[in-house]
Amino acid sequence: TTLLGAVDAAVGGKTGINFNGLKNEIGAFRPADTVIVSTQFFQTLPQNELLSGYAEMLKHGLIDNPATYRSLLDFDLSMPDWEKLLPLLKESIQVKERIVAEDPFEKGIRKALNLGHTIGHAFESLSHKRETPIPHGFAVAWGLICELLLSHRYLKFPSETISELAAYIYRHYRAFPITCKDYETLYELMTHDKKNEAGYINFTLLQTIGKPVIDCHVDKEEIFVAFDLYRDLFKL
């Protein structure tokens, strides 16, 4: 009944629950027999719930292609046209379906769907530690900015694209407040991420829109630089 459920949780058969303040610590792969999406439910959602789901759609656009991404940026979230949302929603679901069909158990390209989630999950867990929980999609939106900043440093992702998305994110989602005192806590939370291998924190980064690069090992110092740049970008 939420936009987030329709574009993310309902597709791909991955189930997970949080445990001990950490995201998705326990879970399984179990595809549904049937998934039915009705946009009528979305029309009664609070704005925060609409925004939360839309962040996952933005992620799908980033890993898919420039045309999909541009159509999402051009959609007016402040006054949603539900007829125009439907094809965007359908395309977003199909992006995830195509990736899941190719890699159902997340051994390869399905990891592209984790864009924004390594740092996003850390933001989300920190918000729970602060006892001021944030919606999942908001955490993903802010995580996208941080991980695109890493993408620029590691893969030369275009800085102008980051600036445009950051302005969009700030307009609709504002910014998650962090200081340098939070860096170690955020890093420690990231060490519990299920995508990590051999002691490395694994990221999905982007070379450009539509060209994700999975299993990127990022140094602690570079993660902290990304936090610095995030704070500079949002004037925190």
Language-model segment annotations:
Residues 1-77:
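A glycine/threonine-rich phosphate-anchoring loop and its flanking beta-alpha core
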Residues 44-49, 81-83, 133-135, 196:
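Structural motif
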